[in-house]
Structure formats: structure tokens, C-alpha cells
């Protein structure tokens, strides 16, 4: 299991990675998702933390600068921009949601992983140009907000600061308007 988690913790670059490695990672992520769904109550606290750390290694990444991306704003068009690695990201988010939504989930088991720095990085992902990712993030944020009482005040303050920074920058691209709308619906 440790080898699978280590392999899936590596983020692949589309230009530099082999397709067979990307396919192998997707297969292992699906296997980890099935394992999580079937065995979460029996998993040790350490194993659950390791799973969430693998998820964070996948989802927390530098985002392309929205303003500097060439071409029109991705949210202006009907054809929305998709994150090239959405297949892997989607599976990683689903693993996280499976853990957060499980009836036997104990938030205390993840206090060392799901903390203020985690929330900072999670909120930054709302600037992703991929609407699928922002939609998934809304659900993740809602589950964390509901489960981690100790992070609620921090989350409200950071969301307020995020919204104010977007508003005060004066740049009202459709993407930023969408970020405001997405975050505002959840908090």
C-alpha cells in the first residue's frame, strides 16, 4: 500500500511523462478509491492520513495565471477549459470526499493534515480555470466546514479576505466573477 501511495503522490507533467505511467497512476488511484470505500472503518489513523497526504500531493499545485493565459477567458466560452490532469485530480478529490463523507469518519484523525495551511491552499484552488475542479472544491469545502469545527472561523475569515481581494483588485474577468460566485455559495 505504501508503494502505491508513493507512486500516486508523484504529479505527472503531460509533456514529460509516459502515457503508460499516467494510465498506471489512474488505475492505482481507482484501486485506492475502491479500497477506501470498502475499508475506511478498518483503516488506521495513519493510513487515512497517508491517503489524505497523497491527495494533497496531487491537488495542491501551481495554477496557471488566469490573466496571462493566452486567448479568451476560459469561462467566457461555452467550451470550458479543462485541467489536463483532471482524470487524476478527479480520482484524488473523490478519495478525499469518500473519507470526509463516510459515516464513521472522525475529524480528529485528520487534524494534523487538514489544518490552516491545508485550508489556505484549498481556497487558492478556487482560482483554477477548470469549472469541474471549482465545483468539486465547493463540495470539499462544504464537507470540511461541516466536519472541522475548529477551522470554521478561520475558513470564514479567509473566504472573506479572498472575496475582498478579488473585488478590490478591480479586475472583473469572468473567471474572477465565477470564483466569487462559487465561494460565496458555500460560505
Give the ranges of each region predicted by the language model.
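Alpha-helical solenoid scaffolds in large eukaryotic transport, assembly, and signaling factors
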Residues: 1-187
Amino acid at each position: 500500500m505504501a508503494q502505491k501511495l508513493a507512486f500516486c503522490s508523484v504529479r505527472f507533467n503531460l509533456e514529460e511523462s509516459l502515457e503508460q505511467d499516467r494510465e498506471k497512476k489512474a488505475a492505482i488511484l481507482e484501486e485506492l478509491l475502491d479500497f477506501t470505500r470498502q475499508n475506511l472503518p478498518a483503516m488506521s489513523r495513519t493510513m487515512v492520513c497517508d491517503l489524505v497526504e497523497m491527495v494533497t500531493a496531487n491537488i495542491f499545485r501551481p495554477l496557471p495565471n488566469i490573466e496571462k493565459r493566452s486567448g479568451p477567458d476560459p469561462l467566457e466560452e461555452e467550451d470550458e477549459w479543462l485541467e489536463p490532469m483532471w482524470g487524476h485530480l478527479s480520482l484524488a478529490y473523490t478519495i478525499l470526499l469518500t473519507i470526509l463523507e463516510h459515516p464513521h469518519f472522525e475529524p480528529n484523525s485528520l487534524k494534523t493534515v487538514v489544518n490552516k495551511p491545508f485550508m489556505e491552499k484549498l481556497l487558492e484552488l478556487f482560482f483554477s480555470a477548470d469549472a469541474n475542479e471549482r465545483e468539486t472544491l465547493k463540495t470539499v469545502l462544504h464537507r470540511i466546514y461541516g466536519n472541522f469545527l475548529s477551522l470554521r472561523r478561520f475558513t470564514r475569515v479567509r473566504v472573506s479576505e479572498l472575496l475582498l481581494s478579488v473585488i478590490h483588485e478591480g479586475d472583473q474577468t469572468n473567471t474572477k466573477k465565477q470564483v466569487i460566485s462559487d465561494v460565496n455559495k458555500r460560505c
